[in-house]
C-alpha cells in the first residue's frame, strides 16, 4: 500500500525569533521545496542557470519568513502574546518550528477547515524521564504523537501554519492558538479530556480561550471553537470551564498570572484567578 507523503526530508532553513529564540521560523530545504511543487519545477526545467532555479525558492522563503515574523511581532507587542512566548522561552531545550502549511504531511490533512496544526515532541523531558525512558506527559493522549518534520532534531514541536489561510483579523490569533498547544506540549501538561460546548476537548478550549483573550485585547470580535459569538459569562457557564481554568492556573502559575493581568473585556482567567489566589487584578 502506498504511503502518504512526508514532504520534509532534509535539513531545514531556520530563522529564530529573537524575543524567544527557541521559536523558529522554519523553511524546507530547496530540494524538498522543488519536490513539493512539481509544476513549478517543470516550468523552470530546461537550459537554465543555477541562479534561475535558486531565485523562486529564495523568494518564496523570504516571503514566508517575513509574514510569520510579522505575526510573531504582533504577538510580542501584546500582553497575551508575551505571556505565551515567555512560557516557550522558559524551556530553551525544546524548539517550536513553524513550517508552511503546504508541508504538513498529507496523513494529517483530515479536516480541510483546519487553519493550523501542531505536532508533538516524542522524547523524554525531565532528568527522571530521560533516565527511565518515559515519554513526555500528554504524548500518550495524542492519536499519532509523531513529530514528522523534526525527526532529525529531537525535542522539537512542529507548527504548520500559513497566514494566507486565515482572515486578516484572525491570522495572528490562529498562530497564537497553535503556539498555545506547543507551549503546553513542551511544558509537559498537554493532555486530552472531553469538553462540551463545541470544543471537543480541554486543549482546544485552552487554546481558543487564550486566542480570544488576545482578540479581545485587540478589541476584535471573540468566538468559540466553531465560530459562534461568545462573551466571558457564557464561557464561564460551560460545564468544566472553571475546573479547567483552575487546573491551568495550578499547573502553569506564571502563565495564569500573566494572562490574568491582561486588560481585555473577555478574560475568563482573570475571574477565576481572582478567586483562586484571592487577589485583586
Label each residue range with its predicted role.
Residues 24-26, 95-97, 158-160, 173, ...:
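Ordered hydrophobic segments in well-structured contexts
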Residues 68-71, 171-172, 179, 203-206:
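Stable alpha-helical elements in mature extracytoplasmic
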Residues 2-44, 190-281:
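Active-site or metal-binding loop neighborhoods of secreted/extracellular toxin and effector enzymes
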Residues 102-172, 182-186:
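Active-site scaffold of zinc-dependent metalloenzymes
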Residues 1-133:
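A metal-dependent hydrolase signature that marks the N-terminal structural subdomain at the beginning
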Residues 59-62, 66, 75, 165-170, ...:
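Soluble non-cytosolic domains of exported or imported proteins
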Residues 77-80, 180-188, 212-219:
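Sec-exported extracytoplasmic/periplasmic mature domains
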Residues 65-68, 80-85, 114, 172, ...:
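Short amphipathic alpha-helical segments that mediate assembly, nucleic-acid/protein binding
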